[in-house]
């Protein structure tokens, strides 16, 4: 029978990856049979077979739909169901925490290596979907910039969107970052998390959680979040928290989104940071100039050669960096320079904040302070220091922490649009024949003029290069001080008040 064989294969996968131990085989089989409302079972010979997890989960979810165990075959319902299956294979939090702490005692990097592998083995991070993401790099005056078209977040079909909209609203868990997600079954408007495990850590004297992002935008993309559902705030404590984590996991960087709309991330309601083990172009950016700040002569300070406006501070004692970061933040929050169109506030609404990123380089701690301002104007209603309308056909979303560091996370629609646009450019057919390409028309005409020899073999490379240059332009838009003589003079005026 197909069901028995697929259950046996799933359990064999658990054995091969260490999710299931031999003493738990029978128990695990019976737990899976219960989900399928199946009273019988016949032994299957699958020992040593190479198991492709996505295929097994697809087959089991198909059976569940055929049997009426799930009432819909859309992507959301299927994900809710196959996560339930993986929850059966996933050991309880206590076991994962114990294993992590044992390995951490030996070596923090080995502990995160093991936890990252586990988070993929149990399908919390869906390897098969992450592989679909399109990634490339482009050269820029600031170094090699990373571009991704994110295809790992599944597109919901209209039926699933309607079901999510009509689902009863619940305040549990309060958001997708809360501790209460661990083991939660999910619903049409909230993902299933039976296979989600959190490592508890102490940050600034309170209980925090450490987990990986299920969408891993870069290597070992982790999320470090407050045990309490409290809002994001960039202040003295935020800097303390960043370095508390870096001291525990010196092989990772950690950063925070800004705490104001437009320049912040998508979740401002829950205090959290994002980090990981990846070398972004920003980390390798050169110091454009070094400066000395009175009272902090022992701290190395410089302006970074980067499209956004970044002050980098370096010292072996992180406490000195926290003190200086406090000083810079306080001055920036209250800073106005009308000539540079920087206003600390208008009509009582604050505009200035910082996107901070901490890391350790050898024995030296480093903190990058990215100056942000969320003022809007009539010409730029979405934000003056935000992607301008000429770039919205590629990127109009907020420039958050990940983008600040030099990684574009672009919408999945671009994959299909680029394929269609490539066809039009090569065949020289009218772009306006395709409604979804009209927004790209001006840009496409510039590409045609720039590359008269565009053809089948070079068109995708050309489009990737030009998308990359659009993103560089987007980052330059987000910089409060432009990389021009005038912009740098204005930056110097701010440095002078420090």
How would you label these PLM feature ranges?
Residues 1-224, 228-231, 305-307, 321-325, ...:
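Active-site microenvironments that recognize anionic phosphate/pyrophosphate groups
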